[in-house]
Amino acid sequence: MSESLYSIRMRSSCDERHISGAENLAPAERLHALASAMVRRALAHDKGQAEQIFLSIEKVDTADIVCHGLPDIRTIRVASVEQGRDAALSMLEKAGVNPQAARRAMATMARGAAPNGDSMRGAMLVDASTGQRLEKDRYRGVRVSRMDLDEQTSVRLKNLLQTAGLDNPHVREALVLAAKVIHAPGVIAELCWSDDPGYTAGYVAGASLGYVRFPLLKPAGEVRGGRAFFLSSDADLAQLIPYLERQVVLIDRIGRIFPDERWPA
């Protein structure tokens, strides 16, 4: 790869409460437009207008970039939040997560995984066998960063998602993050639903599952959300956390979208 890339990241908050975040990998000529778009996003978010906006831009060593493909996409239609969570638990068990560990993590996310009952800024790390939480900071968690689609793959993904009626920022950004996470050493599966009050969908992702969407994983208006990464018992956190937080990953291939399914099948 000959073109120089920069990692541009935004996070915003209000009264020490996380409002929004965004990030891209981009050449220098796109940085101004991306920075403007990120600031607009922080100032016009469903969770409120940010009072603090932090932008970070750093040049990426192209020799350090790792390329991955996106997972296949499945959507499982459910009739209620309860049904959606049952379906998600079933997918986590299928991926190799102990059912009790999955239920424990889901209950923690539902009541707010941070010690004060709010959403964490990053993800929980959960032992997939025991359910034990492994992250050191239960407010911050582990923040996955430095990943994006290459330009051609971005266009292809947008066209594919438009055809399926799924083209929105939540899906695009979640797919990219999930692609990085499921390639991480020691990760068995990911559970996620958004902390945006107007977005009720969530997903389970794993190397063996792909990306499995559920339109209802939380009630409308709920601001508690987050991520749980389920780890094998022999996962090396000293290797895993730097990969999630600092390894630059560029997505250069899209997956397939399968027809919607209904739960129960």
From Swiss-Prot:
Uppermost EC category: ligase
Entry keywords, A to Z: ATP-binding, Biotin biosynthesis, Ligase, Magnesium, Nucleotide-binding
GO MF annotations, alphabetized: 6-carboxyhexanoate-CoA ligase activity; ATP binding; magnesium ion binding
EC number: 6.2.1.14
Gene Ontology terms: biological process: biotin biosynthetic process
Ligase as UniProt keyword: yes
Cofactors demanded by this protein: Mg(2+)
Top-level taxonomic group: Bacteria
Quaternary context: Homodimer.
Family label: Belongs to the BioW family.
Protein name as catalogued: 6-carboxyhexanoate--CoA ligase
Protein's organism: Syntrophotalea carbinolica (strain DSM 2380 / NBRC 103641 / GraBd1) (Pelobacter carbinolicus)
